[in-house]
């Protein structure tokens, strides 16, 4: 049934976001109390977006937060992190993901953090996420940065602590895997678009619960190759899928379905690992001609943002929501 639903979503682009709330009251803990030294400044950026700035480990960091105007603060609200790619920006991520409209429709909050600048002997960038691999020379603690944002969000909003998710493009996808491994107690599920796991994330991964994983990738991606990149410390996509299928005790081999778009000259392969613990799932969507991009229905018959929310919203920290 789940396989048919996702394939229908890809073919028709008509699936709305999921969103059934789970009864997680017994898991809720009181929001943290700010230490006296913590200071955060939030300003109105328009269109229901706030820009919040604070100093983290002696670096000025910021994030953009979108709260739908019609959000019900009396009900527990799911929270989605959307992480930009290497050298990218939070504002650009807002534009190409279009998660705001999905948040309006499905009642969740979206946070778009901004990565810190990075300079090493090999590379230099205006922004990055420290997830190992080619960013291993960084001394930025992005896991703690994200957790600090979570703690602040709990103070300001009625966040459902069992339904905090992460997704990202490229380096943001790598970071989402890194959070699944290193902030597992806070992150219910993740989705990666054109990202993978770095060698460090893969080797040191220590999740605390079965974790739903969605990977969307292009077979022709030259930046994060499907087969991996040893020089830059990138695991192959099959290696990443196999890691999570094994950790979640899924069936060793996936169920595979292929949607052919003959007129457009491409196909989309869908791999679904079944019978995982807590009814979670590990899923790979592989587009035959996609390169390094965030796909949508109009360009590649693949509505990534809709598919991501439909996938993530099925789960909380305890697995599939009843």
Predicted segment positions?
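Histidine-bearing beta->alpha loop at or near hydrolase active sites
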Residues: 289-293
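Sec-dependent signal peptide recognition
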Residues: 1-9
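Serine-hydrolase catalytic machinery in alpha/beta-hydrolase-like enzymes
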Residues: 53-70, 74-165, 174-178, 182, ...
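Hydrophobic h-region of N-terminal signal peptides that target proteins for export
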Residues: 9-15
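A domain-start/cap signature at the N-terminus of enzymes
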Residues: 15-79, 91, 105, 138, ...
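The feature captures the conserved acid-bearing segment of alpha/beta-hydrolase catalytic domains
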Residues: 188-268, 272-278
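Post-His helix in hydrolase/transferase enzymes
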Residues: 297-305
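The conserved beta1-alpha1 loop
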Residues: 81-87, 194, 217-218, 288
């Amino acid at each position: 049934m789940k396989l048919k639903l996702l394939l229908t979503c890809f073919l028709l682009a008509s699936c709305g976001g999921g969103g059934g709330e789970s009864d997680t009251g017994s898991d809720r803990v009181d929001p943290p109390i700010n230490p006296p030294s913590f200071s955060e400044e939030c300003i109105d950026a328009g269109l229901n977006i706030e820009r919040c700035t604070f100093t983290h480990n002696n670096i000025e960091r910021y994030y953009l937060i979108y709260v739908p105007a019609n959000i019900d603060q009396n009900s527990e609200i799911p929270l989605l992190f959307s992480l930009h790619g290497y050298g990218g920006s939070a504002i650009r991520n807002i534009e190409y993901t279009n998660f705001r409209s999905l948040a309006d429709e499905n009642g969740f909050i979206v946070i778009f953090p901004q990565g810190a600048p990075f300079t090493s002997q090999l590379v230099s960038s205006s922004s990055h996420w420290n997830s190992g691999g080619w960013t291993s020379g960084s001394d930025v603690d992005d896991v703690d940065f994200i957790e600090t944002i979570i703690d602040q969000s709990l103070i300001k909003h009625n966040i459902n602590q069992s339904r905090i998710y992460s997704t990202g493009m490229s380096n943001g996808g790598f970071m989402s895997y890194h959070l699944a491994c290193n902030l597992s107690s806070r992150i219910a599920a993740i989705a990666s678009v054109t990202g993978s796991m770095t060698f460090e994330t893969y080797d040191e991964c220590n999740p605390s619960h079965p974790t739903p994983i969605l990977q969307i990738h292009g077979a022709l991606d030259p930046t994060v190759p499907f087969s991996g990149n040893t020089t830059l410390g990138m695991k192959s996509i099959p290696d990443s899928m196999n890691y999570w299928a094994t950790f979640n005790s899924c069936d060793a081999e996936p169920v595979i379905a292929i949607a052919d778009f003959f007129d457009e000259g491409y196909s989309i392969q869908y791999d679904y690992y079944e019978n995982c613990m807590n009814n979670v799932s590990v899923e790979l969507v592989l587009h035959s001609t996609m390169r390094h991009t965030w796909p949508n229905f109009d360009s590649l018959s693949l509505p990534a943002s809709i598919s991501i929310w439909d996938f993530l919203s099925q789960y909380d920290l305890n697995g599939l929501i009843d």
